[in-house]
Amino acid sequence: MASKADVKKVLDRLQIETPSWAYGNSGTRFKVFGQPGVPRDPFEKVEDAAQVHKHTGAAHSVALHIPWDKVEDYAKFAKHAKDLGVVLGTINSNTFQDDDYKLGSVCHPDKKIREKAVRH
């Protein structure tokens, strides 16, 4: 069994990328439930992510989801994150809500739908 010191060393190196949607309203596949204090825009989501990183030291990166985290100036957005001590990480595109993606997006049986997903 690993000692507490060994476990702590591993945890000190642990880095987690949190998804931006984790800082918004949540719910089930049937309904999203509004909550007070939820971020109103991507900049506020990053501010919440910075608080998580401040308290854990392990969540320095935030994965974005487009179109929900779309902003006009990504350089300004990245600087905002950096100023707060976090970075913008993975970019996830929404290739699942469009009706065309009912049978998948980049693996759809219809070549036109696959191409649409790639263009997205």
Where are these regions (language model features)?
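N-terminal pre-domain/capping segments
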Residues: 1-120
